[in-house]
Amino acid sequence: MVDQNKAFGWAANDESGVLSPFHFSRRENGENDVTVKILFCGVCHSDLHTIKNHWGFSRYPIIPGHEIVGIATKVGKNVTKFKEGDRVGVGVIIGSCQSCESCNQDLENYCPKVVFTYNSRSSDGTSRNQGGYSDVIVVDHRFVLSIPDGLPSDSGAPLLCAGITVYSPMKYYGMTKESGKRLGVNGLGGLGHIAVKIGKAFGLRVTVISRSSEKEREAIDRLGADSFLVTTDSQKMKEAVGTMDFIIDTVSAEHALLPLFSLLKVNGKLVALGLPEKPLDLPIFSLVLGRKMVGGSQIGGMKETQEMLEFCAKHKIVSDIELIKMSDINSAMDRLAKSDVRYRFVIDVANSLLPESSAEILTEQVDHGVSITSRF
């Protein structure tokens, strides 16, 4: 049996997505590992999708959370990059094969054997990974990030998913090569508001695209967008046809792509980042007649993620957050489902994750040699 350390978090046990106190085990810190005491963890929209099994591949119990900032409390003997007491981060992935074409190009996020921070098997198949809604995590040092000085631990946490999710496609699809290009950001939520900030830091002229005008003043006056386009205003949409070089589509709900394609210039590029539950219709005619492109992007590799953190620290880019207690997570998930957050929930794990000593132990199961105990 693998050596284990006791750990505690909040887990979903079924498709209701309700999170409850949960005792489980982490592996012992190995020679290549870093043990992290978790201070803060962001709440990503994919956490909501996963705990409710919207994508059909959830395996319960699940402790979500892949926007983790904490303190290194142990380092393995082969680890030279980190030392005890360092402020570190853990993002969406915690393992890959390290030998495929993608890994050799620092694109571990596209490795066929990528290991996700939660709802996945460990690299050796002996245990199930659990995420950052918990007190501690043990991670291979190659998938641990250094949090730069000046980057806050709480509002910096969402950058480990939301930040790299918008930063990587901006680099790959050529949005950073020439300042003054026009970028449309469809949707002003957890991803969208970071896309505005990073886009402006890259010298782009940013237009927020939204269904309503409620966030217009905030987008322009506080987030720094250059303009705001309401998709229900037919006259403004007509005036904006062919004005944008790029569009980053952050919307996860079902929506039409044709109005967005019409906004692109010839050779324009639309990059989809949201993950709707159902496939979207792709209007081929608009692409062909305008030599336009549609692409996608999934987070980034470790090297690029570290680069993104340094970039955000330099430009003082953080997420706009609402700090919550662990006990507030279920109401936060309900609000997230209604897009009732500006713009990211972050759990104050260190100050609010408290075991309930009086709670009754209801279930205990053994999963590939790893004992998991659920408490409610």
UniProtKB/Swiss-Prot annotation:
Catalytic activity: (E)-cinnamyl alcohol + NADP(+) = (E)-cinnamaldehyde + NADPH + H(+); (E)-coniferol + NADP(+) = (E)-coniferaldehyde + NADPH + H(+); (E)-sinapyl alcohol + NADP(+) = (E)-sinapaldehyde + NADPH + H(+); (E)-4-coumaroyl alcohol + NADP(+) = (E)-4-coumaraldehyde + NADPH + H(+)
Coiled-coil regions listed: none
Protein purpose: Involved in lignin biosynthesis. Catalyzes the final step specific for the production of lignin monomers. Catalyzes the NADPH-dependent reduction of coniferaldehyde, 5-hydroxyconiferaldehyde, sinapaldehyde, 4-coumaraldehyde and caffeyl aldehyde to their respective alcohols.
Positions that bind Zn(2+) 1: 44, 66-67, 161
Record-listed E.C. numbers: 1.1.1.195
UniProt entry keywords in alphabetical sequence: Lignin biosynthesis, Metal-binding, NADP, Oxidoreductase, Zinc
Cross-referenced Gene3D superfamilies: Medium-chain alcohol dehydrogenases, catalytic domain (3.90.180.10), NAD(P)-binding Rossmann-like Domain (3.40.50.720)
Pathway membership: Aromatic compound metabolism; phenylpropanoid biosynthesis
Residues given in the record as NADP(+) binding sites: 46, 165, 187-192, 210-215, 250, 274, 297-299
Cofactor(s) listed: Zn(2+)
Family: Belongs to the zinc-containing alcohol dehydrogenase family.
Subunit structure: Homodimer.
Group of enzyme by EC: oxidoreductase
Protein name (record): Cinnamyl alcohol dehydrogenase 2
Cofactor note: Binds 2 Zn(2+) ions per subunit.
Molecular functions (GO terms): cinnamyl-alcohol dehydrogenase activity; coniferyl-alcohol dehydrogenase activity; zinc ion binding
Gene from which this protein is expressed: CAD2
InterPro entries reported for this sequence: ADH-like_C (IPR013149), ADH-like_N (IPR013154), ADH_Zn_CS (IPR002328), CAD-like (IPR047109), GroES-like_sf (IPR011032), NAD(P)-bd_dom_sf (IPR036291), PKS_ER (IPR020843)
BP GO annotations: lignin biosynthetic process
Binding site for Zn(2+) 2: 97, 100, 103, 111
Summary of the tissues where the protein is detected: Expressed at the base of the stems.
Superkingdom to which the source organism belongs: Eukaryota
